[in-house]
Amino acid sequence: EIAKRDKLKFIQNGLKDYSAQRNYDFGPKSRENVSNLSKYISHRVINEYDLVREILSQYSLQKVDKFVQEVFWRVYWKGWLEHRPEVWRDFVDSDPTYSEEEYKKAINGETGIECFDDWVKELKTENYLHNHTRMWFASIWIFSLNLPWELGARFFMKYLFDGDAASN
């Protein structure tokens, strides 16, 4: 199955450089520096506990600690949100005010901000954005385009294959 193949590929080839390379977005055609497992983890095809256990059976924690930390952070934020259901309800029930014109420009990749517009296209075609790109995207969405974060979160959840309320 594809998830097992991708997991094995990352454990054998990508994990050793993960800590040094994970923060760089080399574009949609070059994702060897990240695990590419988030879509499987988000949909429970791969379980976090089993993944960490398998990795630690092959590597010392010292060699893979950054990846293990990232998995633990994901589990932490899932638990945090589960214990605060009102946060999710408030998000779902929110009805923020915004400029419909600016919103349409943003979701169509027509803002005039080249990197942002490229990321919109990448999100819609690849259904993925690098973690750091997601942060830059959100910053531009809120502070440059003055759009409510709730709309950006909904936009992400609509397109991201690995969309996760606690992690995005």
Model-derived segments and their meaning:
Residues 1-165:
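Structured secondary-structure scaffolds
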